[in-house]
């Protein structure tokens, strides 16, 4: 079995904490939180692309 796509124990714990926090949010706050997370993911993706591009050239 490929282990690269599995979460670490620390990641599983963080996910459980996020689930608990999400259940307490109302719809507006949930949407706002989702937008913030998506923005963070896009920034992370851009950072990874930047480092990959600059490490090859």
Swiss-Prot record:
Domain of life: Eukaryota
Pfam families per UniProt: NblA
Gene3D superfamilies: Phycobilisome degradation protein NblA
Subcellular location: Plastid, Chloroplast
Keyword list, A-Z: Chloroplast, Plastid
InterPro entries: NblA, NblA_sf
Gene Ontology annotations for the cellular component aspect, listed alphabetically: chloroplast
Similarity remark: Belongs to the ycf18/nblA family.
Protein name: Uncharacterized protein ycf18
